[in-house]
Regions:
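Non-catalytic cap/lid and distal C-terminal segments of serine-dependent acyl enzymes
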Residues: 26-186
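Bacterial signal peptide processing site
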Residues: 21-23
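Sec-dependent signal peptide recognition
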Residues: 4-13
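C-terminal motif of bacterial Sec signal peptides marking the signal peptidase cleavage site
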Residues: 16-19
Length: 186
């Protein structure tokens, strides 16, 4: 395993989506709410980033064993995550990568992150990496949904609260053991 290292460049993905301008004035409405409205301070994704690149990363599905952390009974279950691997990723290489973990919104699935909008997120990652706007990175999309996804999850709170346990105990160790990531050796 590689030794632990952080790179701030991978944070550009998040900044690309919010892109605030420090020179803009904050309105009274924004001040009274306690935080600025980022909706008015985002930038559109450049049109050329919506198409595929010559250097495409890949998205792979991984199924993994986990526990039912909602009920706390330790019952085994399985879950699915999707992993974006940047163009040029090789298992046999010594190169290591930072990892981002994303969770879908309400009514979505782990697959939604990479499938919605004709794969726009994968295309965006490919373009950012190809143009040198961010370092190559592994992106993992997981789900708090147990079983078959439905459009309406009436009581998602227990599942959302249980997700960190699943990430820390099951998914992150699997990703770190299967892919070339920066990890801290213990």
């Amino acid at each position: 395993m590689c030794t632990f290292s952080m790179t701030i460049k991978t944070f550009l993905l998040c900044l690309c989506l919010t892109a605030c301008n420090g020179n803009e004035e904050v309105t009274e409405a924004e001040t009274s709410s306690g935080y600025p409205s980022l909706l008015n301070k985002t930038v559109p994704v450049p049109a050329e980033y919506l198409g595929e690149t010559a250097s495409q990363g890949s998205v792979v599905q991984i199924d993994y064993d986990t526990r039912n952390y909602v009920d706390g009974n330790g019952e085994m279950r399985s879950n699915t995550a999707y992993v974006y691997l940047p163009y040029g990723y090789k298992e046999s290489s010594d190169e290591c990568y930072d990892v981002f973990y994303f969770v879908h919104g309400h009514g979505e699935t782990a697959a939604s992150f990479f499938q919605n909008e004709n794969g726009m997120m994968r295309n965006l990652l490919d373009h950012l990496i190809e143009k040198g706007d961010m370092s190559p990175v592994i992106v993992v999309s997981t789900s708090y949904v147990y079983g078959t996804p439905v459009d309406y999850y009436p009581d998602a709170d227990p599942y959302c609260k249980a997700l960190p346990q699943e990430l820390v105990n099951d998914l992150i160790p699997l990703v770190e053991s299967r892919y070339r990531t920066y990890t801290q050796q213990t």
